[in-house]
Amino acid sequence: MDAIVTFFQENGHNLLVQTWQHLFISLSAVILGIAVAVPTGILLTRSPKVANFVIGVVSVLQTVPSLAILAFIIPFLGVGTLPAIIALFIYALLPILRNTFIGVRGVDKNLIESGRGMGMTNWQLIVNVEIPNSISVIMAGIRLSAVYVIAWATLASYIGAGGLGDFIFNGLNLYRPDLILGGAIPVTILALVVEFALGKLEYRLTPKAIREAREGGE
């Protein structure tokens, strides 16, 4: 315990810098994942056969070891922050894509037909009916993806991208448990804080009528 306290005292500034790097890399990958996976997931609901193929391909990509992905990217993008973000982006895709597809497909068809009866365009149906009624499922995928990515981002230090993984791998190389814990504890806290914040965001994004209906059902 004394060693850990000493670590935080001696590495306070570096810890803040590495935490910021870790958060930047992780959130950049998740935001890219959202930008690609949510629209793609919505489009795939219009073509279930294509959806099975696309989700299958993304699922296979996620089974590839992260170090293998990094090794594949390095010859094209070199080392540093960008290849780390691209690699993490690949891992961020599946939970968001799958949950968006499942959530939008699960929207009550009567609501969609009612919207069409009111003269809504496809875009209006997506924005006003499908997304609001599937936001909790979509956000569950985003929350899961964010936690995964924050954990996997420790490997970014292997290619010089920085982050809290620097402490962990330095600790492993030097047989310094204090460095290992000094990196692992902030990663865990960061994942919990981001998951909590996204949970609050999900609550805010869920339409009030839907929240009240769920709370009344409980």
Swiss-Prot record:
GO terms for biological process: glycine betaine transport; transmembrane transport. The chain crosses the membrane at residues 23-43, 48-68, 79-101, 149-169, 179-199. Disruption phenotype: Mutants are impaired in both chill-activated and osmotically activated carnitine transport. One of its GO terms (cellular component) is plasma membrane. It comes from the Bacteria. The keyword Ligase does not apply. Disulfide bonds: none annotated. Gene3D superfamilies: MetI-like. Keywords: Cell membrane, Membrane, Stress response, Transmembrane, Transmembrane helix, Transport. InterPro entries: ABC_transp_perm/SBD, MetI-like, MetI-like_sf. Residues 19-198 form the ABC transmembrane type-1 domain. It is a multi-pass membrane protein. Coiled coil: none annotated. PANTHER family: CHOLINE TRANSPORT SYSTEM PERMEASE PROTEIN OPUBB, GLYCINE BETAINE/L-PROLINE TRANSPORT SYSTEM PERMEASE PROTEIN PROW. Belongs to the binding-protein-dependent transport system permease family. The complex is composed of two ATP-binding proteins (OpuCA), two transmembrane proteins (OpuCB and OpuCD) and a solute-binding protein (OpuCC). Part of the ABC transporter complex OpuCABCD involved in carnitine uptake. Probably responsible for the translocation of the substrate across the membrane. Involved, with BetL and GbuABC, in osmoprotection and cryoprotection of Listeria. Can also mediate weak glycine betaine transport. This is Carnitine transport permease protein OpuCB. It comes from Listeria monocytogenes serotype 1/2a (strain 10403S). The gene is opuCB.
